[in-house]
């Protein structure tokens, strides 16, 4: 009889612990919702100018991607007068996407070195973050605050 009581208490303790762990998790999102993050970036962060969303075909060309490289893409860019932009890419191959983004940044750096040298500082430390199956790139005049906002989004 005592063993039944002990077993019930152990089961209850384990069940309670499991519920606590499942409810608290690690305090991070299970995945990035592109539209939500884009809204947060546009509403709560000040870029050098208002960014415009581009369609997936334009984003593919811009970042040298093909449809097989990503599952979803959401990109906002400025005019050619500024480097500011951000892109959210859901993919099965984050490594390949990051490689393409780095190539894109190298070319952009070369172009802006001659064209708009005052924009170069933004390109020296761009944000490229990988979270699960998503890659996020942000180029702005205040990458520290942009990164902080992105990380706050992940915690919610």
Give the label of every model feature segment:
Residues 1-10:
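Positively charged n-region of N-terminal signal peptides that target proteins for export
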Residues 52-81, 96-97, 123:
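Short, compositionally biased low-complexity segments enriched in polar/charged residues
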Residues 27-29:
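Bacterial signal peptide processing site
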Residues 22-25:
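C-terminal motif of bacterial Sec signal peptides marking the signal peptidase cleavage site
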Residues 119-156:
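A short, solvent-exposed beta-edge/loop patch
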Residues 94-132:
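Short Gly/Thr-rich strand-loop-strand
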Residues 9-17:
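Sec-dependent N-terminal signal peptides
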Residues 83-94:
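A short acidic-to-branched-hydrophobic micro-motif
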């Amino acid at each position: 009889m005592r063993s039944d009581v002990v077993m019930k208490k152990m089961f209850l303790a384990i069940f309670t612990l499991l519920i606590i762990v499942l409810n608290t998790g690690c305090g991070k999102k299970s995945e990035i919702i592109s539209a939500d993050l884009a809204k947060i970036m546009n509403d709560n962060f000040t870029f050098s100018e208002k960014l415009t969303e581009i369609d997936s075909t334009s984003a593919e060309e811009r970042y040298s991607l093909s449809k097989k490289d990503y599952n979803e893409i959401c990109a906002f860019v400025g005019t050619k007068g500024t480097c500011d932009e951000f892109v959210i890419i859901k993919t099965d191959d984050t490594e390949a996407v990051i490689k393409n983004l780095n190539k894109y940044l190298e070319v952009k750096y070369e172009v802006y070195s001659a064209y708009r040298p005052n924009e170069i500082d933004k390109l020296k430390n761009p944000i490229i973050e990988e979270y699960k199956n998503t890659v996020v790139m942000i180029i702005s005049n205040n990458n520290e605050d942009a990164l902080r906002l992105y990380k706050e989004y992940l915690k919610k």
